[in-house]
């Protein structure tokens, strides 16, 4: 098994060597820009790791891995427009650097380019791989719509929130692993166990993201800290805080959520203080650990040598240790 760093190098090299020569150049420049912003490449790495886990050649899975990364970045490009986000990985977002129309159209082309990569897999598994990829893509869009629907609602349950992040975030990690396993020659049931691993890990990852949005270092996080609080985004932290807050604390929280004429920094500081008072962060971390354990249980049922699975266990640890 190759290390995560070796697989990241293979992926980054393939991305750097990808040149979009089609016209007009303005359509493709944002794709190159966003893809070259970097990141951990966790989803394509999971494709390659899953292929290797079952004895497959990572280079046979490389096109599918790049396809997954293209799709992931397409969702980021469009999400940033919907969220009006100024930064992505510490740099201006595509719509901030160009404009919203360019971001929408370039994102559409990224989705097409992702499919063009995905259909390069071996014909014997093409149908299965495309089924997983299509279901994954639909799930991500369904999750995004659910997230947008939450904006219009005063109350969202923890159960609803977990279902939304499973679709919006976790299914892409899960689908990446299932596709990699299929390319590596895994039986369908074994590939589904990797899907289960990725799904639970993805939920844990999003919960960690919720924590970092409040408590992270913006330089290391690569995004605006406190953005979820400023926009009243329904995260696990806010939903749990609304459940737990009583009397004067509940009144103060409601005041900040309903008042649009506020100083953003003061709002972030005050709501964060409420989270601290209610020990919401510790509750999110406990929930996160629950899903990590579920992920590792699924991995334990995968029928390959334990030594091969160690790298995925390590990946899980790396995924969840994002610097604050």
Segments predicted by a language model, with ranges:
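All-alpha prenyltransferase/terpene-synthase fold signal
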Residues: 1-324
């Amino acid at each position: 098994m190759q290390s995560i760093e070796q697989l990241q190098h293979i992926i980054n090299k393939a991305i750097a060597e990808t040149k979009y020569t089609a016209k007009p150049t303005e359509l493709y420049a944002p794709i190159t820009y966003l893809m070259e912003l970097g990141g951990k490449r966790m989803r394509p790495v999971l494709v390659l790791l899953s292929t290797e886990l079952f004895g497959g050649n990572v280079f046979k899975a490389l096109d599918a891995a790049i396809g997954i990364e293209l799709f992931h970045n397409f969702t980021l490009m469009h999400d940033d427009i919907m969220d009006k986000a100024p930064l992505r990985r510490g740099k201006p977002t595509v719509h901030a650097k160009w404009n919203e129309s360019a971001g929408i159209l370039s994102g559409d082309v990224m989705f097409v380019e992702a499919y063009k990569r995905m259909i390069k897999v071996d014909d014997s598994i093409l149908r299965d791989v495309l089924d997983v990829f299509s279901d994954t893509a639909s799930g991500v869009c369904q999750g995004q719509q659910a997230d947008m629907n939450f904006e219009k609602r005063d109350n969202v349950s923890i159960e609803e929130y977990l279902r939304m992040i499973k679709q919006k975030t976790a299914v892409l990690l899960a689908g990446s692993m299932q596709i990699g396993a299929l390319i590596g020659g895994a039986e369908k049931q074994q590939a589904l166990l990797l899907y289960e691993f990725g799904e639970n890990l993805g939920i844990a990852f999003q919960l960690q993201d919720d924590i970092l949005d409040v408590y992270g270092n913006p330089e290391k996080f690569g995004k605006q800290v406190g953005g979820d609080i400023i926009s009243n985004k329904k995260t696990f932290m806010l939903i749990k805080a609304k459940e737990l807050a009583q009397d004067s604390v509940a009144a103060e929280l409601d005041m900040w959520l309903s008042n649009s004429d506020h100083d953003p920094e003061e709002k972030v500081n005050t709501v964060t203080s409420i989270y601290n008072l209610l020990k919401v962060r510790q509750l999110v971390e406990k929930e996160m650990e629950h899903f990590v354990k579920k992920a590792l249980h699924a991995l334990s049922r995968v029928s390959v040598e334990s030594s091969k699975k160690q790298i995925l266990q390590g990946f899980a640890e790396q995924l969840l240790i994002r610097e604050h």
